[in-house]
């Protein structure tokens, strides 16, 4: 996600009718990253933050300046980050795991009595390495080039380079007691992969994605407890291949969705509902590898693009991608309620019908996905996913105990996933010496939930426990294909937190937290053709501390310390693609392991203006 973490003020999770405003990709809900709200009139603030991590030498910094003078508002932020290769107990330093990141954001706007108009300009530049996990057969160690310095902040081959530009115009107007919002956005994302030592400035994969987003919706004033909202939103996209290697075809896409939601408050009961219609049209272009008989000869990297439509009869093996058009449409809806059973005890229920159109990677991939050791193949016959989901939420709060329970049951038709291919001898299919995976679909049932409890017998002491579980089953399949791939393992997180000083003269909000992060063994995996393997359980011990430092009654700085994976446990997360890289022939262990012990320090300094 091309987002500067330092710019995120809060994170919101939307489910139920409210998520209908966000289109087909919001089938399971919406995760919204909110930036900081604009300041009050006459206020100006600045701050500087910096941090360091010992495991991979990660150094980051961020400078922010915001203000509001007579309704003219601004918010400027510049952030940077760099890290060398991380290390763990089994692999040592992991070649290709270094990164560099830069981000610049500028908000300019005007707040007035009838609403606001804000223009946000963002630039994000990420240069991550690519972990290939190739090993020396004799020693079992990860292969590294001669003269490689594991603590270098440079860019060892291979690596990616991502440039992301974004402009968003956010308008809001009050119409009586109602509200009209118009949002227009443009994004340009260019992703390049560099892998040739002989030609370090020439990239293999190079594609550029243009996206235009639009959103217009109206929220009515409350009338006898009723609220209505209606609108239209969608996007236009164009993707262009500029390199000599390819993963997905060039394409353009247009979609739109119209929606309406309603809510009603009746005493302690809140009712809500909504409906949405989505339509998406995708036009994927052909790409043909040039041969001597081609009349459209080109010296451009040995390839020529053909954007014309074809019925497929004249296509032959020289075509990397075949042109096709697909249209998808679906109707979604949701009904929900929230009821205050007791002043401290609430219940939420929601039933939703979901829809998701397959994306271009799932439909038309045909190339090596670097860093995953996969040759990915799309499937143009895929159908949209359709689902029914039921959610139940309970929450209770008292001076001593706070508890939440969230359960869900999801039935998805045509659930899309990728499967490793095997030949008639049950041996992996290799394309360009890389295992081949193809997108397919099936009917799925997904059950799960999360339970959390926080016990605070005294104000300063907290005992927290959270347990999450997901069971995802593919219906009417053999035992090897029963469980869906990339299902997270059951997880239990337990912590104890104590605040030593509250409103102290020198130290304020001083706290220490000890945490145990226990990930249970995942035996529910997609075993067909060895697409996945079981993942052993592991437990991580972490420690966190923080305080505000004050001088003459004013906050001078905030200091945060942490130690993660204190026991230096070697582990692999079940969702990590790195666990399927090369086998260590000496130890028999497969893949690359996650980061080992890591200590962090972070300082945030407010600047008075």
Predicted regions mapped to residue ranges:
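Outer membrane beta-barrel strand-and-loop segments of large Gram-negative receptors
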Residues: 202-217, 377-383, 389, 398, ...
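Gram-negative outer-membrane beta-barrel transporters
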Residues: 408-411, 429-522
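Transmembrane beta-barrel wall of Gram-negative outer-membrane proteins
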Residues: 56-82, 92-131, 159-176, 222-223, ...
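Flexible loop and strand-edge segments within Gram-negative outer membrane beta-barrel domains
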Residues: 83-85, 95-97, 101, 115-176, ...
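Structural signature of Gram-negative outer-membrane beta-barrels, strongest in the C-terminal barrel
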Residues: 223-229, 233-235, 243-412
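C-terminal beta-signal and adjacent terminal beta-strands/loops
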Residues: 356, 411-414, 418, 518-525, ...
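Transmembrane beta-strands of outer-membrane beta-barrel pores
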Residues: 50-56, 69, 80-84, 112-114, ...
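N-terminal periplasmic accessory domains that precede
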Residues: 1-3, 13, 25-49, 61-63
């Amino acid at each position: 996600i091309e987002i500067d973490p330092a710019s995120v003020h809060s994170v919101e999770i939307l489910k139920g009718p409210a998520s209908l405003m966000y289109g087909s990709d919001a089938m399971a809900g919406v995760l919204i990253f909110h930036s900081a709200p604009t300041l009050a009139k006459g206020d100006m603030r600045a701050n500087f933050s910096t941090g360091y991590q010992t495991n991979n030498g990660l150094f980051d910094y961020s400078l922010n300046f915001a203000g509001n003078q007579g309704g003219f508002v601004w918010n400027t932020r510049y952030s940077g980050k760099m890290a060398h290769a991380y290390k763990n107990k089994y692999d040592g330093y992991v070649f290709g795991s270094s990164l560099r990141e830069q981000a610049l954001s500028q908000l300019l706007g005007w707040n007035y009595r009838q609403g606001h108009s804000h223009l946000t300009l963002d630039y994000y530049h990420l240069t991550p390495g690519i972990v290939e996990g190739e090993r020396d057969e004799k020693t079992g160690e990860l292969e590294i080039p001669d003269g490689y310095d594991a603590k270098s902040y440079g860019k060892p081959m291979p690596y990616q380079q991502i440039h992301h530009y974004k402009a968003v115009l956010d308008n809001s107007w009050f119409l009586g007691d109602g509200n009209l919002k118009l949002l227009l956005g443009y994004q340009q994302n260019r992703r390049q992969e560099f892998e040739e030592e002989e030609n370090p400035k020439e990239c293999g994969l190079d594609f550029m994605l243009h996206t235009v987003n639009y959103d217009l919706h109206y929220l009515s004033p409350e009338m006898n407890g009723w609220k209505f909202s209606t609108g239209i939103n969608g996007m236009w996209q164009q993707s262009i291949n500029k390199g000599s290697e390819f993963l997905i075809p060039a394409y353009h896409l247009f979609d739109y969705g119209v929606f309406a939601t309603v809510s009603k408050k009746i005493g302690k009961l809140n009712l809500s509902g909504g409906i949405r219609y989505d339509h998406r049209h995708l036009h994927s272009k052909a790409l043909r590898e040039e041969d001597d008989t081609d009349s459209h000869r080109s010296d451009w990297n040995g390839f020529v693009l053909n954007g014309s439509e074809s019925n497929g009869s004249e296509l032959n093996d020289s075509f990397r991608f075949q042109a096709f058009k697909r249209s998808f449409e679906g109707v979604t809806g949701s009904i929900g309620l929230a009821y205050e059973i007791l002043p401290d005890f609430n219940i939420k229920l929601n039933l939703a019908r979901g829809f998701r159109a397959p994306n271009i990677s799932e439909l038309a991939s045909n190339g090596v996905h670097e860093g995953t050791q996969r040759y990915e193949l799309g499937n143009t016959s895929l159908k949209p996913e359709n689902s029914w989901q039921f959610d139940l939420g309970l929450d209770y709060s008292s001076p001593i105990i706070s508890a939440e329970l969230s359960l869900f049951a999801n039935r998805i038709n045509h659930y899309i996933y990728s499967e490793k291919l095997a030949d008639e001898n049950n041996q992996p299919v290799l394309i360009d010496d890389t295992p081949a995976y193809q997108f397919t679909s099936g009917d799925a049932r997904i059950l799960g939930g999360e339970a959390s409890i926080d016990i605070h017998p005294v104000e300063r002491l907290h005992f927290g426990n959270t347990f999450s579980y997901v069971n995802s089953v593919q219906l009417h399949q053999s035992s090897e294909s029963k469980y869906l791939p990339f299902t997270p393992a059951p997880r239990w997180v337990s912590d104890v937190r104590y605040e030593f000083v509250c409103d102290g003269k020198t130290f304020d909000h001083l706290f220490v937290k000890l945490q145990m992060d226990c990930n249970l063994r995942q035996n529910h995996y997609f075993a067909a053709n060895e697409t996945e393997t079981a993942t052993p359980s592991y437990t991580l011990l972490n420690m966190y501390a923080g305080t505000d430092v004050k001088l003459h009654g004013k906050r001078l700085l905030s200091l945060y310390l942490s130690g993660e994976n204190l026991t230096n446990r070697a582990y692999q997360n079940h969702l990590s693609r790195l666990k399927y890289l090369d086998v260590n022939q000496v130890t028999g262990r497969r893949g690359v392991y996650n980061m080992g012990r890591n200590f962090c320090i972070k300082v945030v300094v407010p600047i008075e203006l």
